[in-house]
Design a protein with these regions (language model features):
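Active-site Asp-x-Gly
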Residues: 105-117, 150-154, 161-216, 232
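ATP/Mg2+ or Mg2+-diphosphate-binding catalytic cores
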Residues: 20, 226-250
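Short strand-connecting beta-turns/loops that link adjacent beta-strands
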Residues: 50, 168-170, 220
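Short helix/strand-capping connector loops at secondary-structure junctions
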Residues: 217-226
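Short, low-complexity, intrinsically disordered N-terminal peptides in bacterial proteins
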Residues: 1-12, 247-250
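An alpha-helical support segment within catalytic cores of ATP-dependent transferases
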Residues: 83-154
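Alpha-helical elements of Rossmann-like donor-binding domains used by nucleotide-donor carbohydrate transfer enzymes
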Residues: 26-33, 70-77, 138, 200, ...
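ATP-binding pocket architecture of kinase catalytic cores
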Residues: 4, 11-114
Length: 250
């Protein structure tokens, strides 16, 4: 989201600028929506303008197993606060939705499979090589055709390690792309780019054994975004995740 800097004389506040007016508003709305579920694990918004977002500085600490377990339990509490629908934006927010600097759809949908395929994966694959596109589209069709026994969760939506700031006794989330989604999507993104004490987060969360089977499917979204924005280095991982998804759905 654009350049970041501290305001002079306000070292307890972190302020970053944004390139589009809706970016700051979307992030602030997402943070406040997540905080309604459990404020202790969400960075506190102090000010939002059309060009910037200010949040209270987090007292960070070295990651630890107990903090990771506590964060996992807290993340489950946030998820269980729920959302009106899959693809539902943060409460009261009517503007655009972003993952990082990239705009993405966020329209309420009754079906998780339909939402995930059409709004979180397919929008990012049009410019990719035909072979990659083909297998990803096959996976998306299979996802849409499957029955999913899951209720809309209140998810962060961009929960990689850089958006988790460990504290002495837990962790705090920043920079969300919050929406109504599948709770395992947050967990799978934590795994994708490597998060300290990831297994302890899962333990604290209480992730079921079958979760691991579906990790590649839940990583299709961030991999598709990175394939679009970062190029060929992500083509093979995206293709493999799509193949693993098809295998899991057989």
């Amino acid at each position: 989201m654009g350049a970041a800097f501290f305001y002079a004389g306000a070292m307890d506040v972190f302020t970053k600028t944004v390139s589009r007016p809706d970016q700051a508003g979307a992030e602030a709305a997402g943070l406040r929506w997540l905080a309604q579920a459990l404020a202790a694990v969400v960075v506190d918004v102090t000010e939002v303008t059309s060009s910037s977002l200010s949040t209270r500085r987090v007292e960070q600490a070295r990651p630890s197993a107990p903090a990771a377990r506590a964060f996992g339990a807290a993340l489950r509490t946030v998820h269980e606060a729920g959302a009106p629908a899959f693809g539902a934006p943060p409460a009261g927010w009517e503007g655009a939705n972003f993952i990082g600097r990239v705009e993405q759809p966020c329209e309420p949908c009754e079906s998780w499979g339909e939402f995930y395929a059409e709004q979180r994966v397919l929008p990012f694959v049009d410019g990719l090589p035909q072979g990659v596109q083909g297998i990803v589209r096959q996976a998306c069709e299979a996802i849409k055709a499957a029955d999913w026994d899951v209720k809309p969760a209140r998810i962060h939506g961009d929960l990689w390690a850089g958006n988790v700031l460990f504290t002495a006794d837990s962790a705090v989330m920043i920079d969300p792309a919050a929406h109504g989604g599948h709770p395992w999507t947050d967990l799978a993104m934590l795994e994708l780019f490597g998060t300290p004490f990831y297994e302890e987060i899962l333990r604290g969360y209480g992730a079921p054994k079958e979760y691991e089977k579906w990790v590649p499917m839940h990583q299709l979204h961030p991999l598709a975004v990175h394939a679009m924005t970062h190029g060929p280095a992500y083509y093979a991982p995206l293709e493999q995740a799509a193949r693993s998804t098809l295998e899991a759905l057989r």
